[in-house]
């Protein structure tokens, strides 16, 4: 099963996305996979074929400002949660996704959850993979410093920050081939660093967390919470607290995984997601 690479222009912004389709016809709803910071849709490339093999088409975009998607100037794109939500809404409308299951991960996963809460009619099922889900969630220092005056401007222009951040969060080394993909946007243009800087500075986790906490208490769609027990940035207590507030949600922990479970434990993540989608 191959994963295709596509681009589409939405409101003058180029979106890059990956798409995996089952062989033959399938009546299953698509799965939309959203990545975190400073990751890319590439992080889902081992999961997508597994979904397709079981009949689930999947789409994984690079957020605006990340990967191979457009990296507009801050004067043209605010890099706030609302700006990301609006851009995502238009992307989904352009692809004519009427209803789908949503999988979110990491520190942009919160924006994906906000989208779901604001558009529940679109969401069949919701899976939350190691994302900030409460007002108490804080960016780890490794990410906080990327938004600091002067220091952040320098750090976000260093392609090796990808190595330090992804490996620091996952607690494992990534292969050189994988790191080459993640570094490439930073080597190609300074725009990648500027977009990352703007995103970190405008993430508004406290405000987002309040909206998420309130909204998920009323959430009706089936929900899966997946957490890496070795996540150094978002402890499993965050997931346990969310589960306590959502009695109908399912919590699955992965003993060996850190903040980016789909990177090193893609087979386990795939199995958990497929089991959830089938129920």
Task: Specify the residue positions occupied by each region the protein language model found.
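N-terminal cap/lid segment of alpha/beta-hydrolase-fold proteins
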Residues: 1-14
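Catalytic active-site module of serine/aspartate enzymes centered on a nucleophile-bearing elbow/loop
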Residues: 249-279
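Active-site loop/oxyanion-hole signature of alpha/beta-hydrolase fold enzymes
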Residues: 11, 18-21, 53, 60-104, ...
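Conserved serine/cysteine hydrolase catalytic core
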Residues: 192-244, 253
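Glycine-rich nucleophile elbow surrounding the catalytic serine of serine-hydrolase chemistry
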Residues: 105-114
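Conserved HGGG/HGGXW glycine-rich cap/lid loop of the alpha/beta-hydrolase fold
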Residues: 20-68
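Flexible "cap/lid" loop of the alpha/beta hydrolase fold
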Residues: 117, 124-156
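Conserved alpha/beta-hydrolase catalytic His-Asp/Glu region
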Residues: 139, 156-217
């Amino acid at each position: 099963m191959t994963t295709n690479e596509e681009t589409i222009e939405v409101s003058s912004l180029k979106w890059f996305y990956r798409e995996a389709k089952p062989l033959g016809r399938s009546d299953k709803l698509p799965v939309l996979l959203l990545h975190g910071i400073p990751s890319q849709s590439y992080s889902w490339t081992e999961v997508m074929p597994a979904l397709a093999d079981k009949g689930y088409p999947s789409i994984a975009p690079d957020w605006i400002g990340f990967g191979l998607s457009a990296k507009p100037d801050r004067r043209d794109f605010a890099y706030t949660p609302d700006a990301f939500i609006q851009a995502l809404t238009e992307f989904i409308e352009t692809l004519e996704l009427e209803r789908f299951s949503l999988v979110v991960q990491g520190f942009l996963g919160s924006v994906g959850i906000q989208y779901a809460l604001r558009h529940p009619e679109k969401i069949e099922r919701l899976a939350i993979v190691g994302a900030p889900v409460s007002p108490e969630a804080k960016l780890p220092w490794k990410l906080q410093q990327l938004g600091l005056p002067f220091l952040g401007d320098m750090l976000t222009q260093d392609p090796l920050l990808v190595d330090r951040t992804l490996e620091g969060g996952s607690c494992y080394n990534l292969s050189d081939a994988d790191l080459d993909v993640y570094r490439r946007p930073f080597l190609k243009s300074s725009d990648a660093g500027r977009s990352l800087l703007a995103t970190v500075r405008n993430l508004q986790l406290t405000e987002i967390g309040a909206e998420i906490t309130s909204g998920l208490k009323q959430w009706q769609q089936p929900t899966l919470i997946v957490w890496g027990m070795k996540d150094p940035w978002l402890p499993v207590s965050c997931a346990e607290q969310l589960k306590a507030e959502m009695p109908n949600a399912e919590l699955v922990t992965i003993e060996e995984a850190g903040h980016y479970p789909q990177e090193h434990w893609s087979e386990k993540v795939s199995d958990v997601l497929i089991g959830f989608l089938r129920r």
